[in-house]
């Protein structure tokens, strides 16, 4: 899959964005600053990478945890999670089912629109994601706007996508860092 759009950091920093993803968990995120594309994070199947802005270099992240493209609630039991419906709650003006997934001490709360079951909000210990502007892409409904909020506000961003290409084949070197 190839996601294209822009990311807004803080109040006024805005950068063109491309996110390359390939199963099972390969990923590369690129932002364009000026006219130069910069890889800011990625995973090559063995190592995670992230930009170290102090030395302006992409570096291996020893504590990187590869994530599946499928969210935890898809086939949650086989992934070791338990689920509990906590009732209904509003997200904006939409009524949502509030569902908590738990694995060990990790909890994530999901809010699904009661009308269409779209995931509108995901709350983890250190980040809240808000999904909106849903559009159909090759028969799949996907959010074209994702807002991330953190408790300390230092990692907040808004991602606005203008194009999503599914089933995209990438050159072999796409995920080599």
Residue ranges and their predicted role:
Residues 34-37, 56-58, 116-118, 128:
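Short, surface-exposed beta-strand-loop junctions and turns on beta-sheet-rich folds
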């Amino acid at each position: 899959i190839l996601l294209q759009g822009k990311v807004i950091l803080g109040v006024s920093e805005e950068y063109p964005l491309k996110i390359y993803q390939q199963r099972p968990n390969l990923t590369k995120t690129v932002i364009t600053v000026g006219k130069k594309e910069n890889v800011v994070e990625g995973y090559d199947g063995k190592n995670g990478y992230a930009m170290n802005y102090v030395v302006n270099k992409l570096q291996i992240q020893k504590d990187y945890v590869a994530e599946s493209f499928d969210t935890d609630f898809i086939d949650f039991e086989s992934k070791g999670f338990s689920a509990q419906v906590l009732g209904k709650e509003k997200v904006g003006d939409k009524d949502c089912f509030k569902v908590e997934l738990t694995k060990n001490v990790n909890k994530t709360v999901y809010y699904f629109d009661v009308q269409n079951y779209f995931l509108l909000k995901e709350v983890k210990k250190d980040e809240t994601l808000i999904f909106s502007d849903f559009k159909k892409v090759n028969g799949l409904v996907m959010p074209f706007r994702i807002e991330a909020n953190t408790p300390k506000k230092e990692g907040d961003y808004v991602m606005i996508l203008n194009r999503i290409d599914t089933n995209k084949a990438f050159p072999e070197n796409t995920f080599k860092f």
